[in-house]
Amino acid sequence: MKKIGVILSGCGVYDGSEIHEAVLTLLAISRSGAQAVCFAPDKQQVDVINHLTGEAMTETRNVLIEAARITRGEIRPL
């Protein structure tokens, strides 16, 4: 089976990979008969955004851990 690498960067339209775009990309790869292999940088996000207000937050999040939300844990560090 052909494998296609997908690089994600966090999870969220303002501070990471846009969820709809990522999921539809993974679906298209699957429907084409290939296997998606997902990767993300294992580092802290530069900015964390409150998606309800659009304002920056002071907390920190890891890019790899946030991207794992989209892939349900099936992701490798870059």
Question: Model-derived features: where do they sit?
Answer:
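Extended, subdomain-level signal for the structured scaffold at the beginning of enzyme domains
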Residues: 1-78
